[in-house]
């Protein structure tokens, strides 16, 4: 039987570290097959094909980010009820979230498929890569239900304190995706569409296996027919928490789309460099994302247990781990960025290699800002203040839009390199005072509840 784990007692640092490691390994796997995906496309299909995949990166983030944000939000009430040991309501939340996911994912898939071509036109996608970008994006949109369910099931399992099981399913998906990539591109000759098909199929199969495993192995999820019914009250709570988290990703992605659109106008070489650099950057920053996800579960459980003081201990522990890792990646990327770029393009592509190196050098200097962003935002979301956390996404969006409109036309690719760091700083300027406000409210709420309890007693 698979086991759940409470994070409401014991030293914060080892608890968070132990929970983060499987998440990190999973995210590294996810980014590894994203790297391999792009490397196979770049090496075997050429620079134009690589640019085709990269031209739609921010659009994919817009849609899938919304889905993933909703999934993370749906897991928060599960974590809170698990922390409060209200297992019946927890099971009802799980059942309702699955039904919501089914309806939402189908609607999103239909709308995005219809609008796919128009989206690429709006983004000023170069004509020489338009056909490949359209094929890749269309297949990705068709596979939205697979992605939605895979991420939701992983979120539910993590909410129960188990970050290991999602890792094993992600490992399966990563290995399968790489094998299918090679088969679809080299054997079947399906081009960039084959890369997207490989990803969608591997996620879909992993989602099915994850669902079967979850209900067979987690006895705590075995509920009654009443608990499996759709309950509108619980659905409203899930949407109230999940949709703002999804919108936060989407709002952030709007700024990324503006930035990528400005970069697309600089030509195919800049698009290819941006694609390579983003794949490498995402590989290294997934540690910050993993720490953030761990803090969402940690803070959610401790909020449910009425222990806000442990949330502050978790912030300090995760910040320490974040700074150590940020220093390590800074040294690694300052020395090795040019070698990582060679994964995607040949040494003869001098301009692309130099631009990729420049992008990574600029980004790694600001990684502590991103680490702080992830820790604070996920913590605020974990205690249920998802609407407040969403405004940090607005700050990111505004920063990227300003860079896209004013800086990129004036300074070119170097301005693109500073787009994300400026967004991280803008978000932190909002999140630091926001967290202070939330933490004070939680402490006051716990104090008030304890006074009421003493009065009743």
Regions found by a protein language model. Name each.
Residues 1-20, 78-143, 187-243, 299-366, ...:
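Short alpha-helical transmembrane segments in multi-pass integral membrane proteins
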Residues 14-75, 79, 243-263:
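Signature of the first transmembrane helix
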Residues 18-34, 139, 150, 173, ...:
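Transmembrane helical elements of multi-pass membrane transporters/channels
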Residues 32-51, 120-127, 183-190, 250-279, ...:
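Helix-terminus/linker motif at the lipid-water interface of multi-pass membrane proteins
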Residues 41-61, 127-132, 192-193, 234-241, ...:
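Interfacial/gating helices of multi-pass transporter permease domains
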Residues 50-110, 147-166, 273-337, 370-392:
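Small-residue-rich hydrophobic transmembrane alpha-helices
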Residues 62-65, 109, 177-181, 207-211, ...:
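Hydrophobic transmembrane alpha-helices of multi-pass small-molecule transporters
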Residues 71, 139-158, 166-174, 195-210, ...:
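Short runs within selected transmembrane alpha-helices of multi-pass transporters and secretion channels
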């Amino acid at each position: 039987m698979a086991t759940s784990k409470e994070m409401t007692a014991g030293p914060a640092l080892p608890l968070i570290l132990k929970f983060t490691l499987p998440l990190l390994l999973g995210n590294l796997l996810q980014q590894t097959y994203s790297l391999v995906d792009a490397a196979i496309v770049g090496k075997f299909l050429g620079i134009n094909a690589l640019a085709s995949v990269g031209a739609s990166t921010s659009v994919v983030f817009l849609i899938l980010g919304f889905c993933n944000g909703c999934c993370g939000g749906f897991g928060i009430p599960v974590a809170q009820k698990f922390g409060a040991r209200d297992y019946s309501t927890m099971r009802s939340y799980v059942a309702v979230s699955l039904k919501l996911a089914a309806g939402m994912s189908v609607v999103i898939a239909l709308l995005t498929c219809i609008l796919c071509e128009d989206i690429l036109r709006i983004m000023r996608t170069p004509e020489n890569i338009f056909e490949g970008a359209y094929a890749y994006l269309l297949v990705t949109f068709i596979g939205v239900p697979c992605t939605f369910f895979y991420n939701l099931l992983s979120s539910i399992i993590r909410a129960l304190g188990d970050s290991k099981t999602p890792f094993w399913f992600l490992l399966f998906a990563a290995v399968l995706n790489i094998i299918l990539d090679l088969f679809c591109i080299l054997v079947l000759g399906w081009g960039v569409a084959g890369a997207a098909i490989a990803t969608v199929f591997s996620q879909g199969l992993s989602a099915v296996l994850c669902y079967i495993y979850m209900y067979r192995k987690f006895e705590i999820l075995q509920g009654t027919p009443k608990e499996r019914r759709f309950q509108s009250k619980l659905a409203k709570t899930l949407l109230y928490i999940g949709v703002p988290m999804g919108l936060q990703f989407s709002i952030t992605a709007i700024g990324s789309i503006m930035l990528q659109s400005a970069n697309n106008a600089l030509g195919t070489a800049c698009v290819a460099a941006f694609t390579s650099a983003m794949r490498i950057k995402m590989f290294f920053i997934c540690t910050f994302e993993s720490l953030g996800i761990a803090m969402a579960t940690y803070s959610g459980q401790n909020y449910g247990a009425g222990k806000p003081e442990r949330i502050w201990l978790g912030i300090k522990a995760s910040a320490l781990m974040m700074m150590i890792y940020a220093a390590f990646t800074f040294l690694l990327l300052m020395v090795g960025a040019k070698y990582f770029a060679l994964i995607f393009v040949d040494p003869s592509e001098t301009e692309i290699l130099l631009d990729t190196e420049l992008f990574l050098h600029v980004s790694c200097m600001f990684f502590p800002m991103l680490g702080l962003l992830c820790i604070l935002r996920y913590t605020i979301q974990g205690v249920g203040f998802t609407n407040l956390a969403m405004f940090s996404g607005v700050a990111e969006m505004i920063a990227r839009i300003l860079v896209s409109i004013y800086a990129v036309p004036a300074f070119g690719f170097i301005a693109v390199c500073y787009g994300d760091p400026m967004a991280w700083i803008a978000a932190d300027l909002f999140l630091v005072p926001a967290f202070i406000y939330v933490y004070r409210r939680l402490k006051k709420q716990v104090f008030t509840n304890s006074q009421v309890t003493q009065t009743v007693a």
